Amino acid sequence: MVVVMESGDVKAPFRGGSNEAGRSDYGATFYKVLLNDLIPMVDRTFRTLSDRDHRAMAGLSWGGHQTFDVVFTHLDLFSYAGAFSGAIFGLDVNQTYGGIFSRPAEVNSRLHYLFLGCGSEEDMGTGRLVADLRRAGVRVDSYVSVGTHHEWLTWRRCLRAFVPHLFKR
C-alpha cells in the first residue's frame, strides 16, 4: 500500500464566511491539484494499481470535508472513503453531491467502504451524519475514540480502525 499525505490547505483567494459556499472556497484549489497533478504523479512514480478499486481517500478535520467533496463527486476514481473528525457540518444527505445518498443502492455498490470516526469529547456532527446516512440506507462504519477531542490521538485511532478494511475486495 502506498500512503500519500498531502496538505489540503492550499492557499487561494478566500472570502471566508460561515455559509457552505464560503467554507467550500477554503482550499478549493486542492481538488484540481489532487486530481490533475498528485494522483497522476503517484501513479507514474510508484507501482500502483491505479483503478478505483485500489484507491482510497481519507482526511482529518477539514480533510474529511475535502474527502467527501472529492470522493462523492469522483466515484469513478475512488471506492473507499474515510473522515476522521470530518468537518462535514449540516450535510443534507438528500441533496448534496447530486443527491447521491438518496440512491443508496448506487452508493453501496460503488463505494466498497465508508468510515466516519471522531473523538467522544468533540462535536463535529459525526454521529448525526452517520445516523442520517444509515436512515438513507447507506452502509457506513463508525468509530468513537473514547476520551479524546479534536486531536492526534483521535485521528491515530481512527486510522487504525479504518485501514484494515481497505482493499479487501
Residue ranges: model-predicted function:
Residues 1-169:
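Non-catalytic cap/lid and distal C-terminal segments of serine-dependent acyl enzymes
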